[in-house]
Amino acid sequence: MAGSTSASLQTPYFPSSTQINPVRVDHTLPLPPSQPSLSFTQGLLVGQLSVVLLIGAFIKFFIFGEAPPPPSRGLSNRTSTHPRSYSINAASTDSSPRPLREKPSTSNILRPVPSSSTNTRSILRKTYYSATPTHPTPKHGRPRLYHSSHQPESLDWFNVLIAQTIAQYRQTAYILKDSPTSSILASLSETLNNPEKKPSFIDIIKVTDISLGEEFPIFSNCRVIAVEDPNSDGGRLQALMDVDLSDDNLSLAIETSLLLNYPKPFSAVLPVALAVSVVRFSGTLCISFVPGPRTSDQTMSPIPTPHDTTSEAIDDQSSDQPSPAQNPDGPKDAHANTSNTTDASSKHGIPKTSLAFSFLPDYRLDLSVRSLIGSRSRLQDVPKVAQLVEARVQSWFEERVVEPRVQVVGLPNIWPRMGRTGLRSSQEEPEAGSGSVEIPVMTSPGADGVSGGGGSGGGSGGGGGGMRGIDRGLSGREAGYEALRYRHAACGGHQNQSGRDGGRGGNEQFAMPGSMPDTVTET
């Protein structure tokens, strides 16, 4: 009994559903720290080496690396439609570049120009212009015109530039119409009344009306052709373009008298009034570049006549030399200037490129001639007078700018110079109706200065200075219309005065700087 009681006390009773999990105690100790595989010296060396490698890579790729190509302006999406082909001369030149340390002598500083640089076919090939046919047919002893297979161009941009130039000339001529020395009227009067040209039976020619026109010539259908020329390598290139001028009021009116000097001088006087207007002009303009004066003399041999020689000499004197009225010492100064120019050109001996232009013989020039003959009983629009005037104008035009005769003009020096450097203003076009507009106008060195065309804001420059600060006195639109026509009254030599031009002396001559007297019909 006692034994069973002690056994029951020692062994407690637990239900079968209850289980006691034994508690596990982790008796593991922390591991000691691991020793580094590299020493301090080795790590320092590795760090220094990495820094040196980074510096070397920076110097190689950022300092001595090739610069990226500059971005193209507006042409990033465009590709060249013509593959560029390199010539043999260019390849040989580029393959052996000149060392930089080589000291060149004075004879080999400028690299030689290939002999084919001025060849017509070489120029056309490098500019991708096909103007020479595959099998050209020669012609006996005459320059052969090769028809271009290239598409003709419209020349719209060229028409805009020419129109701006002509409009500026018209405006300048109107602004300077009151100048006694630089006016278009003075130039025309001096040319028409030249005693070496004018016959003795014609009295003083007085210009009564000048119209510089309102329209502009239109150029179109431009094409480049190759012309055979024995004096040049591979011929020469010539640009042909159609020009048309119609519905314009370009006109000139004069008054004079026919003198009957038999049996005694001034036995009878017959007043004559003429007005010539250009109704329409159309033709084909030929433009080519002449390499030098020697080549031009050989290529374009003139057919001089006594009349042509005299006319050219007079035209040169009237265009290049001032008149005796403008400069009393004109002959001496003009002769000195001419001799200096000739000496300078002969001293240098450098051939300058010139521009030669002419018209083909198939041009069309329609004129309108109005005449009034007599004092009391007047004859109006006599057909025979119109025929004589038209024939004289046609002859004057053909003797100067119709093939085979050409006009040769020296090209100006376009090398950039600081003396010709200007600054474009922020306001391109002044508003219409503004009070004064500053327009620089170059005057001849012999002029003492001219007054402004507006009347109130005219300035005078001494010693041939420019004229600035011109007060036009008209709005931009009115000045444009008034610039087209201005008259010179026949009686008393005074101008027709209006409210804007009141108080002006009519005997003042007008002229345009750079006017060409040879463009006026000769009588």
Swiss-Prot record:
<keyword id="KW-1133">Transmembrane helix</keyword>
<comment type="subunit">
    <text>Homodimer. Component of the ER-mitochondria encounter structure (ERMES) or MDM complex, composed of MMM1, MDM10, MDM12 and MDM34. A MMM1 homodimer associates with one molecule of MDM12 on each side in a pairwise head-to-tail manner, and the SMP-LTD domains of MMM1 and MDM12 generate a continuous hydrophobic tunnel for phospholipid trafficking.</text>
</comment>
<feature type="compositionally biased region" description="Polar residues">
    <location>
        <begin position="295"/>
        <end position="312"/>
    </location>
</feature>
<feature type="topological domain" description="Lumenal">
    <location>
        <begin position="1"/>
        <end position="43"/>
    </location>
</feature>
<dbReference type="GO" id="GO:0045040">
    <property type="term" value="P:protein insertion into mitochondrial outer membrane"/>
</dbReference>
<feature type="compositionally biased region" description="Gly residues">
    <location>
        <begin position="449"/>
        <end position="468"/>
    </location>
</feature>
<feature type="compositionally biased region" description="Basic residues">
    <location>
        <begin position="137"/>
        <end position="147"/>
    </location>
</feature>
<feature type="transmembrane region" description="Helical">
    <location>
        <begin position="44"/>
        <end position="64"/>
    </location>
</feature>
<dbReference type="InterPro" id="IPR031468">
    <property type="entry name" value="SMP_LBD"/>
</dbReference>
<keyword id="KW-0446">Lipid-binding</keyword>
<comment type="function">
    <text>Component of the ERMES/MDM complex, which serves as a molecular tether to connect the endoplasmic reticulum (ER) and mitochondria. Components of this complex are involved in the control of mitochondrial shape and protein biogenesis, and function in nonvesicular lipid trafficking between the ER and mitochondria. The MDM12-MMM1 subcomplex functions in the major beta-barrel assembly pathway that is responsible for biogenesis of all outer membrane beta-barrel proteins, and acts in a late step after the SAM complex.</text>
</comment>
<keyword id="KW-0256">Endoplasmic reticulum</keyword>
<feature type="region of interest" description="Disordered">
    <location>
        <begin position="492"/>
        <end position="523"/>
    </location>
</feature>
<dbReference type="GO" id="GO:1990456">
    <property type="term" value="P:mitochondrion-endoplasmic reticulum membrane tethering"/>
</dbReference>
<keyword id="KW-0812">Transmembrane</keyword>
<feature type="topological domain" description="Cytoplasmic">
    <location>
        <begin position="65"/>
        <end position="523"/>
    </location>
</feature>
<comment type="similarity">
    <text>Belongs to the MMM1 family.</text>
</comment>
<feature type="compositionally biased region" description="Polar residues">
    <location>
        <begin position="74"/>
        <end position="96"/>
    </location>
</feature>
<dbReference type="InterPro" id="IPR019411">
    <property type="entry name" value="MMM1_dom"/>
</dbReference>
<dbReference type="GO" id="GO:0032865">
    <property type="term" value="C:ERMES complex"/>
</dbReference>
<feature type="domain" description="SMP-LTD">
    <location>
        <begin position="151"/>
        <end position="412"/>
    </location>
</feature>
<keyword id="KW-0472">Membrane</keyword>
<dbReference type="GO" id="GO:0008289">
    <property type="term" value="F:lipid binding"/>
</dbReference>
<dbReference type="InterPro" id="IPR027537">
    <property type="entry name" value="Mmm1"/>
</dbReference>
<feature type="region of interest" description="Disordered">
    <location>
        <begin position="70"/>
        <end position="118"/>
    </location>
</feature>
<feature type="region of interest" description="Disordered">
    <location>
        <begin position="295"/>
        <end position="349"/>
    </location>
</feature>
<dbReference type="Pfam" id="PF10296">
    <property type="entry name" value="MMM1"/>
</dbReference>
<keyword id="KW-0813">Transport</keyword>
<feature type="region of interest" description="Disordered">
    <location>
        <begin position="420"/>
        <end position="474"/>
    </location>
</feature>
<keyword id="KW-0445">Lipid transport</keyword>
<protein>
    <recommendedName>
        <fullName>Maintenance of mitochondrial morphology protein 1</fullName>
    </recommendedName>
</protein>
<feature type="region of interest" description="Disordered">
    <location>
        <begin position="128"/>
        <end position="147"/>
    </location>
</feature>
<dbReference type="GO" id="GO:0015914">
    <property type="term" value="P:phospholipid transport"/>
</dbReference>
<dbReference type="GO" id="GO:0000002">
    <property type="term" value="P:mitochondrial genome maintenance"/>
</dbReference>
<feature type="compositionally biased region" description="Polar residues">
    <location>
        <begin position="105"/>
        <end position="118"/>
    </location>
</feature>
<dbReference type="GO" id="GO:0005789">
    <property type="term" value="C:endoplasmic reticulum membrane"/>
</dbReference>
